Curated annotation (Swiss-Prot):
Binding site for Mg(2+): 36, 223
Name listed for the protein in its UniProt record: Isoprenyl transferase
Active site annotation, chain numbering: 36, 84 (proton acceptor)
Gene designation: uppS
One of the GO BP terms on file: polyprenol biosynthetic process
Disulfide bond annotation, renumbered to this chain: none
Length: 266
């Protein structure tokens, strides 16, 4: 668990305390979130889909700050998938503009809160101005000591695995790597998430029971919490419920519960 970052007395007064129902010693180090339901939230309120995406940004800002305050080490969110380009052009253009606007508005505050921002995905396909902002945000916050905030943008899990395989193949062709030495550790080292541990907890909003091509390798042993809450409505209570659910699990990583031994009864 990462120690919450407080900058001066003013910052200390703004930290949201961890709910008493959550064990601070058993927090997940890394939380991943599939932020789903912006469009349905807007449709239910008879609002334009753009309003749903804007409301989703507010939910993300609150969730990020709570995770930072509560000592979560890494937060990785699925912001824009490689498949999202197939959405209507107007919606895609709005999302790109929204990314740019939010980065410009929030970067200074996030830097003051010691958030370290990274963007994971095929960033070369993004608009040039957005790429420039992403580079600025990454460079500005690279030395921060707060939560690691990964924004998966133009990201696809299968694409990430293919690129990792291509990198390994290139190393073999160049004579830098013996194929017999390739193992899980070597493969994971070529992934976009190679600098930190895999997610402990995956949260998916909107009730959908799928992972949607998100972190296919990294989610191998993650605990999964699915909530019917639409992403714009996700709040501190929603996050608390997810953490309580996580702490109720016995993580066995393919093994068995050491407190249970049925063979003694045979």
């Amino acid at each position: 668990m990462k120690t919450p970052i407080a900058i001066g007395a003013e910052k200390k007064s703004l930290i949201t305390p961890l709910p008493a129902s959550i064990d601070p010693l058993r927090l997940p180090e890394h939380i991943a979130i599939i932020m789903d339901g912006n469009g349905r939230w807007a449709n239910a309120k008879k609002l334009p889909r753009a309003m749903g995406h804007s409301a989703g940004v507010d939910a993300l800002k609150q969730t990020l700050r709570l995770c930072n305050d509560w000592g979560i080490g890494v937060l990785t969110v699925y912001a824009f998938s490689t498949e999202n380009w197939s959405r209507p052009k107007e919606e895609v253009n709005f999302l790109m503009t929204l990314f740019e606007r939010v980065l410009k508005k929030e970067l200074e505050a996030l830097n003051l809160e010691e958030v370290q921002i990274s963007f994971l995905g095929d960033l070369d396909q993004l608009p040039t101005r957005l790429q420039d902002l992403i580079n600025e945000a990454t460079e500005l916050t690279s030395g921060n000591n707060g939560i690691r905030f990964n924004v998966c943008t133009n990201y696809g899990g299968r694409r990430e695995l293919v690129l990792a395989a291509q990198k390994l193949a290139q190393r073999v062709l160049q004579g830098d790597l013996d194929p017999s030495f390739i193992d899980e550790h070597t493969f994971a080292g070529e992934l976009l998430t190679s600098s930190y541990a895999d997610p402990d907890l995956l949260i998916r909003t909107s009730g959908e029971m799928r992972i949607s091509n998100f972190l296919l390798w990294q989610l191998a042993y993650a605990e999964i919490h699915v909530t019917d809450t639409l992403w714009p409505d996700f709040d501190s209570i929603s996050l608390t419920k997810a953490l309580i659910d996580y702490q109720s699990r016995r993580r066995r990583f393919g093994g068995v519960d050491p407190t249970v031994n049925d063979y003694d009864q045979v």
